[in-house]
Curated annotation (Swiss-Prot):
Name of the featured protein: Oxidation resistance protein 1
Function text: May be involved in protection from oxidative damage.
Keywords (A to Z) from UniProt: Mitochondrion
Cellular compartments annotated: Mitochondrion
Spans annotated as Disordered: 1-26
Encoding gene per record: OXR1
GO cellular component, one term: nucleus
Classification via SMART domains: TLDc
Family of the protein in this entry: Belongs to the OXR1 family.
Keyword Mitochondrion attached: yes
Length: 176
């Protein structure tokens, strides 16, 4: 999507700039998360985390407001083949990006954005491009509240974009 603004013509270069305001795009539409079953206890993706991730996605992905859960360890079981099957696009023209979210034992989260669906490749072939990135987040809050068992109230988010040092982005195998 492109936005254009007509430039006002000034009678001379020394004339005062016009009072026409510059275009300010509206705030993004909030992200809606769907796909979790009602019984799912460990919902790793929150709307707050999704908004942090959306801010660094390529522009064509930022406009998407409905994010659908493709695979959950809790809902679909611990199977790499199931993950690959669930991610496979319905058509070859389906160009979705995917976000992987993992929670560690310290309740921090990390993951990645990949611009292609995960699938095993032969002969150690890598795929993906420089749009892919890694990220991590940790809930931060008042230290006293955390010590007292209260819930932290802010996510500290950090992204690690593609460096261009090599093209080894995504590699998947069914050998596990």
């Amino acid at each position: 999507m492109s936005f254009f603004k007509r430039k006002s013509k000034s009678p001379s270069p020394s004339a005062q700039p016009s009072n026409i305001d510059t275009y300010v795009p509206p705030p993004p539409i909030p992200i809606e998360l769907d796909g979790y079953s009602q019984t799912t206890k460990n919902r790793l993706m929150s709307t707050e985390l999704a908004e942090d991730i959306r801010n660094i996605l390529p522009m064509r992905y930022q406009v998407r407001t409905n994010w659908h859960l493709v695979y959950s360890l809790e809902q679909h079981g611990a199977s790499l083949h199931t993950l690959y099957r669930m991610m496979k696009p319905l058509t070859r023209y389906d160009k979705n990006g995917y976000i992987l979210v993992i929670r560690d034992l310290k309740n921090s989260q990390f993951g990645c954005f990949v611009n292609e669906y995960l699938h095993p490749t032969d002969l150690r072939r890598f795929y993906g491009n420089g749009e892919c990135f890694l990220w991590k987040s940790k809930r931060q809050g008042d230290d006293v509240a955390e010590e007292m068992g209260g819930e932290a109230n802010h996510i500290q988010f950090k992204a690690f974009p593609y460096t261009g040092l090599n093209d080894f982005i995504i590699y998947c195998t069914s050998e596990f």
